[in-house]
Amino acid sequence: MMSDLPLMELKDIHKSFGNVDALKGVSISINAGECHCLLGDNGAGKSTFIKIMSGVHQPTSGQIIINGQETEINNPRDAIDVGIATVYQDLALIPLMSVSRNFWLGRELTKKVGPITVMDFEKCNSILMTEMDKMGIQLRDPSQSIGTLSGGERQTVAIARAVFFGAKILILDEPTSALGVYQTSNVLKTIERVREKGVAVIFISHNVSHALAVGDKFTVLSRGETLGTAKAGEIDFQELQAMMSGNKELSVLKK
């Protein structure tokens, strides 16, 4: 369910690399159960902004506020500790390993077999199948190679993994990039399911139609600056597309 109170706010975020200003006063807020789409063409500053939220980079100036408290995110561990998980385009999956091993990936449940500690495959596989079923994916076998899954299914595994391990704020970096129509539809359905769990989703994209399908709010970035934010229903495809391409400014985004 969507909350009225911001789960995370980023206020007036600046990031400079030497003399290059990558971000110039970017601000967004996101509530629990909300999908906030961050749109922009290549070079808009989306990747830098993701890395600040996920602790890879630290802002030159600005505030990060989590649950009403100003928070320092100095590294990826800090981000994880406050409930921020990022699913990058490469998904952090190992193609030749099983779906189950990819899902757990260093956090396996274990059991004792005599003096030896081993992965509890039965329990791990059972949880995996349950979590994937919640996301609308029926796996043939948890031991099958993750490389045998479609792109959309692999994306869903990465999202399900992040949610299972406690993500309250889920950052999705171009999750529908290079996917076909059917696979894209499945990923967008997965995002809806995640929102229903109360997880806040930050959907990074340059695809306006995909963003409009799931977004509650839309923020457009251009050359490191926020051009503004609009809620669903306040803006249409043509306006967003024109803003992203730099052809016009939108009064609704300036309000």
PLM regions: where:
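Glycine-rich phosphate-binding loops of nucleotide-dependent enzymes
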Residues: M2-K255
